[in-house]
Every structure is written in C-alpha cells, then in structure tokens.
Amino acid sequence: MTHKISVLHQDKKFDFSLRPKKLTEFYGQKQLKERLDLFLRAAVQRKEVPGHCLFYGPPGLGKTSLAHIMANTVGKGLVIASGPQLLKPSDLIGLLTGLQEGDVFFIDEIHRMGKTAEEYLYPAMEDFKVDITLDSGPGARSVRLDLAPFTLVGATTRAGMLSEPLRTRFAFTGRVDYYNEEDLVAILSRSAQLLSIEANKETLLEIARRARGTPRLANNLLRWVRDFAQMREGNCINSVVAEKALAMLLIDNLGLNEIDIKLLSVMIDFYQGGPVGMKTLAMAVGEDVRTLEDMYEPFLILKGLVQRTARGRVATPLAYEHLNRNPKDK
C-alpha cells in the first residue's frame, strides 16, 4: 500500500513536539513508568517536591524526556544543564540560587561534572542549602544560602562512574533500556501523526527494526524516509521505499551501520574473530574508544554479535553468519 506525505514547513515546531509531555505518551519502559508514576503522584498528593531522580542507560532512550515529563507532572519549571559545563562551584551556584520552588533541575551527563562542583550539590540535595565564599584572602568568609526546594534529575550513560556519595543521594533510580520493535512502532506512529506522515504499520516496522532499539534514532530515520520519498519517490512512502531510503544510509536489516560492519569485519578478517582490545579496534576504524563503548558496543552485544571477555572483544558465530563469513580455526 502506498501513501502520500504532506510536506510541511513547520518542522522546527515539531522538533520539540515529538517529545512526550506526559507518561501516557511515553511508550515502552513499562516497569520504570509504573514506579515513576507512583513516585510522582505520591509526592503531588502530599503537596511535596518529588525526591531526586537518577536515570541511566544508553543514549537516545528518553532520559531527557522523562525530566520534561516530571516537570510537566508537578506543574513547575525545568532548568537544564550539562555535566561537562559544571566543572567549578561557580558554574553551579548561579543555577541553584536561580531555581524556584518545585523546579526540576536536570543535569545531563552528570557523571562528567567536576569534583568540586559535585561536592556543592551534596548540601543542596539534602538540605536545600549551599555555601558560598565571599571575598578572598584573610577576609574571606563563608555564607550559607537557603535554596528553594527542587528536584534534581540526573542522566548518565555511565552510572558506574558516579561517586557513591552522589549516587546514594538520589531517592529514585531507574535504568532506561533498549526498546522492542513493538514499542518503537508505537513511537513512530505518534511521530508520523505529528509530522503529518501517512505510513502503515509495515512501513513503520521496517524503520523500527533498523533503529537499534532507540527512539531518537527511529524518529531521525522516519524523517529521512520522509525526505527520501519527497525527493526520489514523488512523496509516496511504503515499506519498499523505506527499505531503499535506509539502504542509502548503509543501514542493514539488523540496524547495523557502516561502523558496526567495519568493527565486525576487522575482528573477523584481521584478528580471527578475537579476542581483540578496544584500543586496537578504535585505531582500526578511526573512532575513539569512548565512542565505540558508548554508541556501538552495547548494541552489538545486545544482538549477540560480540562478547566481552577478560582478554578483549570476540566476534560470535552470529557475527560470522551475518557477514557471510566462515568461522576460521584459531
């Protein structure tokens, strides 16, 4: 079945509107949503500020969206910062003192905060107070300021890098995991409606199975298919068009992209399937270690294509099969 795409000139407006505004619009993550819903409604019922929350998991899975939803649920403001920008106490104090009662203060990549800035968070999280130093030298003095009660929401792709004093100050901790294809289709269906794209379930499934379990990527691929259909297929979209559009991005039917294939090929063709160290792989494919560990390796492990061992990464029989290679004797 073929559909027509309504070409709009309002994508800037839709960029933000694709983000869910309440938990009922947030598909997937069933157990996490149930816990968070109870946690938030209990605080609202008591007319209290919700406790501090930490969300961790791979990038693109909705951690920032959950912070927006929390702010909408309690009906207060949302202040957003990034861990790498908060290196010194002075980077943090202005944000803390500017918060209004009930605001949600979201720190993305919270594991990358500076140590001294992090220590200033402790009294702010526990007692809603912060110490500032006035003047310098012998005349320096410390003044404790009261802060408006707020909810800190931290997001991280590396929960293990958080210090224990910071981690234990969060009242709610939730892991955001990869999405299954059914949930991604539901997300894509909502996004397609907001973008005025008509696409049947078969077409959305074609996109979902290549989206690496990640809503952010799924929405980006949906837009790409829309653009491809507009420029190459007379605005007509169906599963065949979607497949052609995604093939142009070098994304295969498992969702593997050019870097994924390169990683597996290097492991199999040059290192007999491994084990091989991540530093070696990074040099071979021209990426840094952290990028490979955060963006590529988790999905390859999830799909059963790579195993981590004490000696390095190993390509599995599934990897050989997917690349049409014959396992070699080691």
Swiss-Prot record:
Pfam families documented for this protein: AAA_lid_4, RuvB_C, RuvB_N
Gene symbol of the encoding locus: ruvB
Subcellular compartments: Cytoplasm
Swiss-Prot/TrEMBL catalytic activity: ATP + H2O = ADP + phosphate + H(+)
SUPFAM superfamilies: P-loop containing nucleoside triphosphate hydrolases, Winged helix' DNA-binding domain
Domain of life of the source: Bacteria
GO terms for biological process, alphabetical: DNA recombination; DNA repair
Quaternary structure annotation from Swiss-Prot or TrEMBL: Homohexamer. Forms an RuvA(8)-RuvB(12)-Holliday junction (HJ) complex. HJ DNA is sandwiched between 2 RuvA tetramers; dsDNA enters through RuvA and exits via RuvB. An RuvB hexamer assembles on each DNA strand where it exits the tetramer. Each RuvB hexamer is contacted by two RuvA subunits (via domain III) on 2 adjacent RuvB subunits; this complex drives branch migration. In the full resolvosome a probable DNA-RuvA(4)-RuvB(12)-RuvC(2) complex forms which resolves the HJ.
Binding site for ATP: 18-19, 60, 63-65, 126-128, 169, 179, 216
Annotated spans, Large ATPase domain (RuvB-L): 1-179
Segments for region (Small ATPAse domain (RuvB-S)): 180-250
Subcellular location, principal: cytoplasm
Domains: entry comment: Has 3 domains, the large (RuvB-L) and small ATPase (RuvB-S) domains and the C-terminal head (RuvB-H) domain. The head domain binds DNA, while the ATPase domains jointly bind ATP, ADP or are empty depending on the state of the subunit in the translocation cycle. During a single DNA translocation step the structure of each domain remains the same, but their relative positions change.
Name of the top EC class for this enzyme: hydrolase
Spans annotated as Head domain (RuvB-H): 253-330
Signal peptide: none
UniProt binding sites for Mg(2+): 64
EC number: 3.6.4.-
Job description of the protein: The RuvA-RuvB-RuvC complex processes Holliday junction (HJ) DNA during genetic recombination and DNA repair, while the RuvA-RuvB complex plays an important role in the rescue of blocked DNA replication forks via replication fork reversal (RFR). RuvA specifically binds to HJ cruciform DNA, conferring on it an open structure. The RuvB hexamer acts as an ATP-dependent pump, pulling dsDNA into and through the RuvAB complex. RuvB forms 2 homohexamers on either side of HJ DNA bound by 1 or 2 RuvA tetramers; 4 subunits per hexamer contact DNA at a time.
Family, as annotated: Belongs to the RuvB family.
CDD domains: AAA (cd00009)
Organism expressing this protein natively: Chlamydia muridarum (strain MoPn / Nigg)
Entry keyword set: ATP-binding, Cytoplasm, DNA damage, DNA recombination, DNA repair, DNA-binding, Hydrolase, Nucleotide-binding
Tagged with keyword Cell membrane: no
Name assigned to this protein: Holliday junction branch migration complex subunit RuvB
Binding positions for DNA per the UniProt entry: 308, 313
